[in-house]
Amino acid sequence: LIVGDSGCDGTQAATAAQTLIDSGVSAIVGAACSGATTGAIAVAAPAGVPMVSYASTSPALTTADDNGHFFRVVPSDAQQAVALTDVAAAAGASNPAVLYMTNDYGSGLGDNFASNWSGSVCTSVGYDPSEGSYDASALAQSVIDGGCDSALLMSYATDGAAIMEALSSQGFKGTIIGADGLADAA
């Protein structure tokens, strides 16, 4: 077993994949993050090294130029977006906010939700999930200012928790719906 670290970054993942290939691996398991997987595919596919990801869900990976060498064991976010529209509708949402990370995962999921949602979206705001790069209070305020009845979070656990805390502290009484990225082992 040879381990490489993608750092959840496409450039770092490409470097790690090349190091693994140079070490003679016959396959790569990973990466977890969609952007990192995209970077690794750019190196692994031309080298004929198969990759399987357990967590990369970006719809863009469905049509990636992978020479038939990329596989994943989770569905695309295009499918999750359809499920989220069903959940939002069942929760009685009619004017949801969409708060999404501006990475491959969040952008893809947010775009697919918006295109599958049959009603209007009161606000759609992207943010950089890097710690210190976003203002959870400002994101919450955009939901409140938009008169949204619900908020969909295409977030990871840490930034999602900060946004939910900000929504609560600012008095938001609507429904909060999270995508799979909010899941955390803690």
Describe each model-derived feature in a short phrase.
Residues T37-P46, N67-F70, G171-G178:
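Short, mixed-charge, low-aromatic patches
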Residues L1-L61, V73, Y127-A136, D159-A161:
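Beta-alpha junction/loop-to-helix N-cap segments that form part of ligand/metal-binding clefts
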Residues T15, P59-A60, G68-G171:
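Extracellular/periplasmic Venus flytrap/periplasmic-binding protein
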Residues P59, Q170-A186:
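Venus flytrap/periplasmic-binding-protein-like
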Residues A64:
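Short, solvent-exposed loop/beta-turn-alpha elements that line the ligand-binding surface or hinge
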Residues L20-A32, P50-Y54, N95-Y100, G147-A157, ...:
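Periplasmic-binding protein-like
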Residues L1-I2, T123-S124, I177:
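Beta-strand segments within the central parallel beta-sheet cores of soluble alpha/beta enzyme folds
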Residues C33, T38, L109, G181-D184:
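Short, flexible micro-motifs
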